[in-house]
Structures are given as C-alpha cells and as structure tokens.
A protein has these predicted regions:
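Short flexible/disordered coil segments
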Residues: 50-54, 75-85, 107-115, 136-141, ...
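Short, surface-exposed, polar/charged, turn-prone segments marking secondary-structure boundaries
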Residues: 43-46, 70-75, 110-111, 141-146, ...
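Acceptor/aglycone-binding surface of glycosyltransferases and processive sugar-polymer synthases
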Residues: 1-6, 14-17, 23-100, 122-133
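Membrane-embedded multi-pass helical conduit in multi-pass membrane proteins
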Residues: 151-199
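Hydrophobic/aromatic beta-strand patches that form the interior of the parallel beta-sheet core
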Residues: 16, 44, 114-116, 191
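Catalytic donor/gating beta->alpha subdomain of glycosyltransferases that bind UDP-sugars
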Residues: 90-149
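Structural motif marking the loop-to-transmembrane transition
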Residues: 52-60, 132, 136, 143, ...
Length: 199
C-alpha cells in the first residue's frame, strides 16, 4: 500500500488518504490542513453527514451500523478520507487489519481522533459499489477487524440469552442466538485469516 511505501521511505509529516472516485470532497482539504496544524500528530477522520442512496439501502446501512456497534462498541461514520501523521504509521501497520478495512483499522488503533463533518459527493469515476452484496462484504470486513472484541461480546450475549431462556422457560431463543453468534464468529475469523494470509 501507499502507507507501506511512505514508511519504507521514512517519510516525515502529515498524510492525507482519500478515494479518487470523486466522493471525497477535495474542498475539505483546507479544513484538514487547518485542523492538523492544531495537533499535527492527531489523526483526523472525515465523517459523512448524508448518503444519497435509495431508502431500502439506507435502512440496511443503518442496521449494519447498529449491529457493528452492538458487536464492537464502535460507531463508524467515516471511510477512507482521513489524515494521519507519519509517526502513526508503525501503529496502523503493526497488523494486517488495514488490509481488511482501513477505516476500522483507524478506529481500532487510534482512540482519540479529531472529526470533520462533510457530505459525500457524487461519484465521478467508476461504478457505484453500493449494493447489498458489497455492503454485506464490507460490513463483515469492518467487524472482522474487531474480531477479538466481537468474540468477547458474543460470549456476553450468549450468557445473557441463557439467563433470559431460564426466565421465559424456553431454550429456543438461547439456542438460536448461540448458533447465530457461533456461525458469525467463524465467518469473520475465517475472513480475517484469509486476508491476513494473502498479505
């Protein structure tokens, strides 16, 4: 990746990462420059304020945000568009999480971040990847970055569902949640293993 190249070349300074499809508004570069001057080593994310998608996709996207928050305790409203300092390269490149999902890797490795809010612009290059299949794959990769946290949270959810099953004298709920979370954890660990192996 470009970040690996910058690390190899021992680049010193600020780094801005953005997509080249037109959706990351270059007009906000000025805001990034101004914000970065306050604390050059503080990571900055550009959080999107709106999405121009069809209603069913918006609903599904909000469901994904809720599910990912439930499992990871992270609410990710930003994508690739971001700023980080060269001093942060060692941390973000210390694992292969960046190959799963760059935004999730930022959220995992940098707890304290500055935020700039900006709408997503219309795509000018390439076809939109906003479909149900790509969203599902994207969500799995995002959550896979936090797979260890997800496993812990899943165990807690299984325990809570076990207690609930005792209260309502039914084991169906407990069994369903147990199997669903078991299957889900296997999927995200396999996905992470596959991508880590390829890098």
């Amino acid at each position: 990746t470009g970040l690996n190249f910058l690390k190899k070349e021992k680049f010193q300074g600020g780094i801005i990462v953005m997509d080249a499809d037109g959706q990351d508004d270059p007009e906000y570069l000025i805001d990034i420059f101004k914000e970065s001057k306050k604390n050059p080593e503080r990571t900055i994310t550009i959080n999107r304020t709106k999405r121009d998608d069809e209603l069913p996709f918006k609903i599904l996207y909000q469901m994904y945000l809720f599910l990912s928050f439930l499992l990871t305790f992270k609410y990710l409203k930003f994508g690739v568009y971001s700023y980080l300092h060269s001093s942060s390269l060692d941390k973000i490149l210390s694992t292969n999480d960046i190959h799963l999902a760059y935004a999730a890797s930022l959220a995992k490795h940098f707890k304290n971040k500055n935020v700039i809010f900006a709408p997503r612009k219309k795509r000018i290059l390439g076809e939109s990847q906003n479909n149900y299949k790509s969203l599902t794959h994207y969500a799995l990769k995002i959550i896979s970055v936090f797979r260890n946290q997800v496993l812990i949270n899943s165990i807690v959810l299984v325990f809570i569902s076990f207690l609930l099953s005792k209260l309502i004298t039914s084991s169906a709920l407990f069994l369903f949640i147990l199997l669903a979370l078991l299957f889900f954890n296997v999927i995200i660990f396999l996905l992470a293993y596959q991508i880590n192996k390829s890098h």
